[in-house]
């Protein structure tokens, strides 16, 4: 944890929050430790934009969960710090939501085993938030609750916050762009029974590892998650962007290959530090699903689905591109300056989307399906009055502007 402490001190000096050490000094030792780790893993912008009370509340609530909730106690420290303690999921506005969500669900979850508790949390999420397209801005978890709707990125951010508030390690997973159709999608992974499982946020099912997107996920070229802090041991890392680490989750959903690329200069020497974009055709543009920087040997690699890709590399004003078929694993050699894009002519290309079919989805039993149907009927019957009443009760506990 020495590196985290050094990172905290560096960002403290960078942001100039002189009152923060005094606030931490007034906390119990373990709460202060968690708060410092939380700050250390957060972008400097969050230090400046987010009231300290949000970070301190997250630390105090995470400590309570660690000491009092069985599934939180069982988590390895890296998972607890990155996926329970930390307030940030993606690029949403941060707010002090964890105590609010826990207060709403504590009694409802009492006595439930892990998986049943996760499913119950997702039912609660569905009772309060439904899918509706919005703009590209991601609202805070409490703002989504107040509105009662959100796009998939907001639903998944909301559900991750609710799961973390109840002591589960949870994260948002994201397909930057589909290869077989336009647009993208985000959903949730939760740590349950010692393994990661997926679910559609605010889309309750009778079992985990089941959602409308099962087949689509099996056709993804890339599925990734974000980690603020240290990723779990053994994670397949794509790269780091500031304080966020991108982890590759594709192999959990689709048939994959390890595609390697070697970048050289015009003299055949390895080109270190060149960015390689792995691009997917979507919405009439080549979208960089992932960008990997070459190492000292000029090599870059990505675990990806079995679909066509456009590779684009650039360094020092020079570039090169190539198209790879689903069967290719490389190494694909790209020579900087040898083949720059030529917009003055048309070239035919043939692209293939992944076939899909690899998602290991669960199949509910007959009793599970019956229970799910009964719960959904009950929810639909009570929606108009019960949801309004519950939402009103929760909003009374919110003391901060949204």
Regions found by a protein language model. Name each.
Residues 1-118, 122, 165, 196, ...:
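N-terminal accessory/pre-domain segments preceding catalytic cores
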Residues 103-123, 132-142, 147-239:
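Hydrophobic/aromatic-rich core segments of domains that either
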């Amino acid at each position: 944890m020495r590196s985290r402490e050094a990172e905290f001190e560096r960002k403290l000096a960078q942001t100039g929050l002189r009152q923060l050490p005094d606030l931490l000094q007034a906390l119990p030792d373990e709460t202060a430790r968690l708060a410092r780790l939380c700050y250390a893993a957060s972008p400097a912008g969050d230090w400046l934009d987010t009231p300290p009370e949000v970070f301190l509340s997250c630390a105090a609530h995470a400590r309570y969960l660690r000491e009092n909730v069985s599934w939180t106690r069982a988590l390895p420290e890296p998972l607890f710090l990155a996926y329970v303690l930390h307030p940030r999921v993606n690029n949403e506005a941060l707010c002090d939501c964890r105590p609010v969500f826990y207060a709403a669900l504590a009694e409802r979850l009492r006595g439930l085993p892990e998986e049943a508790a996760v499913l119950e949390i997702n039912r609660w999420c569905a009772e309060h938030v439904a899918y509706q397209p919005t703009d590209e801005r991601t609202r805070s978890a409490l703002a989504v609750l107040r509105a009662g709707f959100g796009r998939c990125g907001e639903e998944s951010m909301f559900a991750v916050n609710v799961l973390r508030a109840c002591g589960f390690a949870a994260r948002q997973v994201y397909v930057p762009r589909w290869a077989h159709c336009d647009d993208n999608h985000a959903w949730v992974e939760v740590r349950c029974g010692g393994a990661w499982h997926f679910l559609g946020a605010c889309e309750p099912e009778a079992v985990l590892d089941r959602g409308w997107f099962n087949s689509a996920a099996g056709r993804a070229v890339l599925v990734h998650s974000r980690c603020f802090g240290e990723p779990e041991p053994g994670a397949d890392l794509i790269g780091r962007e500031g304080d966020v680490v991108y982890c590759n989750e594709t192999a959990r959903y689709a048939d994959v290959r390890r595609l390697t690329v070697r970048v050289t200069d015009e003299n055949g020497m390895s080109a270190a530090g060149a960015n390689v974009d792995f691009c997917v055709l979507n919405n009439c543009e080549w979208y960089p699903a992932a960008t990997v920087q070459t190492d000292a040997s000029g090599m870059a690699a990505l675990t990806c689905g079995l679909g066509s890709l456009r590779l684009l590399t650039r360094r020092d004003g020079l570039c090169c591109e190539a198209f790879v078929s689903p069967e290719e694993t490389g190494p694909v050699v790209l020579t900087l300056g040898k083949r720059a894009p030529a917009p003055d002519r048309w070239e035919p290309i043939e692209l293939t989307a992944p076939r899909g079919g690899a998602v290991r989805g669960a199949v509910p039993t007959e009793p599970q399906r019956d229970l799910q149907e009964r719960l959904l009927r009950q929810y639909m019957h009570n929606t108009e009055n019960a949801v309004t009443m519950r939402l009103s009760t929760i909003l009374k506990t919110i003391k901060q502007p949204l």
